[in-house]
Amino acid sequence: MLLRFAYNKGDYPEYDEMVKNLSNLVDVLPFAEKQADEYCEAYARAHRDDKIQYLIGSGNLWGPTYSYAMCIMEEMQWMRTKSVTAGDFFHGTGEVIGRDDRVSLFYGEDAPRPQMARAEKFLHTICKNLTVFDTAKYELPGIDKKFRGLFSPIGLGGITGRIGVYLEEYGKHPMPIRR
């Protein structure tokens, strides 16, 4: 909706092209989820019962990272998490992560990729349990490269949706059960 306002003011000439790409997501997202499914299952199986999980996301993936950690992993699966942006990671969280802690990085296709890469590079020196979820890894036929960054949160939603299904299965904890 905001992009439409920008278009109406003459500030977003790519609006019609973006809407066309957005309409292609309906067919493309199941394809992306299928590509990620095996990786998501392996992650959930291996890490369902980890003591704590740190999740790092930035840019337009910060909101989905934060909400996935809090709403799905904590509230619906009773898992301990800490979510942080790549920029804030170096202001505290990076000091408390141990060698055996689980850290997941959620890479999008927008401007903060270099920050994410910097956090990942540092993490390789202090932690042996990193998992990278990168929306750029998945083919999205019908989506122009210039819009992939804009649509990264939707792609991550498909990936985390698959993780959630497997966390529920391996934890034997149905999502609707809360305290």
Locations of regions flagged by a protein language model:
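A SIS-like phosphosugar-recognition module
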Residues: 1-179
